[in-house]
């Protein structure tokens, strides 16, 4: 199972939100690349990067775009990016930069046919983020709730050719209170769809449980930033530790 340490960007800084609330934001670093290098030196192979400004407003932030480009250029990790990606032009821009996978969110609810076309055209380079609040899909950086039931929406995505869904239980995100294992147990029963778990993962036992049930990956955020969850132990539990650590990779 893959482990994705998360780097959420706002105004070019690495931050974390609590339950998707932009008024409950903690700034962890003004140097996102430094954060990424620490994760990579610990053994991470993958990074999950979100443009929070783009997710909220629908317009990708230039400051965040600069940081994403820098993250890609320093190499050493597969990078998936989400937040405000609502056009094919933006998808192409990120893929041309060297981003490994683009995550579509709000547009999947508002323009399902577009997501179906993009999934067929770009295949494994497209994932969809399904963010659930009380079982319903939330959009616009979690600021609005749609009329789509989250599990049935995941089935629709699979049937449309989407290969990977990143499923977040918003009520657990950033709370350090544990993730919704029961939801992931149901989701992993959907054949032909890779499920990446996100939101509230705060223990190695949860990572082991997700791996055992067949989840394709887990996104780690606040628990790692706050020191509650050891990234190295998490990588080893998932079987996703980098073979060789690059001790020469600068931290800053």
Question: Model segments located where?
Answer:
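Conserved, mostly hydrophobic/aromatic
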Residues: 8, 39, 47, 94, ...
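Glycine-rich, proline-tolerant flexible connector loops at the mouths of alpha/beta enzymes
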Residues: 46-64, 106, 167-177
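Catalytic cores of alpha/beta
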Residues: 75-101, 182-220
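Alpha-helix-loop-beta-strand connector modules within alpha/beta enzyme cores
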Residues: 58-80, 116-131, 176-203, 243-244
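Glycine/small-residue-rich loop that forms an oxyanion/phosphate-binding "nest" at active or ligand-binding sites
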Residues: 53, 60-120
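Conserved anion-binding
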Residues: 15, 19-23, 92, 99-173, ...
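C-terminal helical cap(s) of enzyme catalytic domains, especially alpha/beta-barrels
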Residues: 114-121, 211-220, 224-252
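Structural preference for beta-strand elements that scaffold enzyme active sites
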Residues: 2-6, 46, 76-80, 100-103, ...
């Amino acid at each position: 199972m893959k482990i994705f340490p998360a780097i959420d960007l706002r105004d070019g800084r690495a931050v974390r939100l609590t339950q998707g609330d932009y008024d409950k934001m903690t700034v962890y670093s003004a140097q996102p690349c430094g954060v990424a290098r620490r994760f990579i030196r610990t053994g991470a192979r993958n990074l999950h990067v979100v443009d929070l400004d783009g997710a909220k407003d629908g317009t990708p932030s230039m400051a965040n775009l600069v940081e994403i480009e820098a993250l890609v250029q320093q190499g050493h990790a597969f990078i998936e990016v989400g937040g405000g990606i609502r056009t094919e032009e933006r998808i192409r821009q990120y893929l041309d930069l060297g981003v490994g996978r683009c995550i579509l969110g709000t547009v999947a609810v508002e323009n399902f046919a577009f997501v179906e076309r993009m999934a067929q055209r770009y295949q494994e380079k497209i994932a969809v983020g399904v963010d659930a609040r009380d079982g319903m899909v939330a959009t616009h950086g979690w600021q609005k709730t749609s009329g789509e039931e989250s599990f049935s929406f995941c089935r629709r995505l699979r049937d449309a050719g989407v290969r990977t869904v990143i499923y977040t239980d918003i009520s657990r995100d950033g709370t350090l209170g544990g993730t919704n294992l029961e939801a992931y147990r149901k989701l992993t029963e959907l054949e032909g769809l890779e499920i990446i778990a996100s939101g509230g993962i705060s223990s190695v036992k949860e990572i082991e449980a997700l791996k055992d049930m067949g989840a394709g990956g887990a996104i780690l955020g606040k628990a790692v930033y706050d020191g509650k969850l050891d990234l190295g132990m998490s990588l080893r539990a998932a079987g996703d530790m980098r073979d060789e650590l690059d001790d020469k990779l600068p931290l800053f």
